[in-house]
Regions:
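Conserved acid/base catalytic micro-environments in cytosolic active-site loops
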Residues: 1-91
Length: 92
């Protein structure tokens, strides 16, 4: 399954493995947030997730990728040469 989160909202996987799209939390800098999605997937599918981080600015995804890796999942990132902005892949 591939998840693509709609702008301004959060996409997460609940404990039963159900994908939920919720209103974005105004306290978070990013909506959607890769950290929210990856973190929830790490809890729901420990060790059975492939996280992919493509071009983007900032550090969103760093904490979620750490949780995925900690649980035994893989995280792939785009290489610097092909990125428009290497911020997110570099942060992971």
């Amino acid at each position: 399954m591939a998840l693509i989160a709609p702008g301004g909202q959060q996409t997460l996987v609940d404990a039963r493995g159900v994908v939920r799209v919720l209103a974005g939390d105004e306290r978070l800098n990013f909506r959607p947030s890769v950290d929210v999605t990856f973190g929830s997937a790490a809890r729901a599918y420990s060790g059975r997730v492939l996280g992919i981080v493509l071009t983007g600015m900032g550090t969103d995804g760093r904490e979620g990728a750490r949780l995925l890796k900690q649980g035994g999942s893989q995280v792939w990132t785009q290489d610097e040469a092909s990125c428009v902005i290497y911020g997110m892949p570099m942060a992971v």
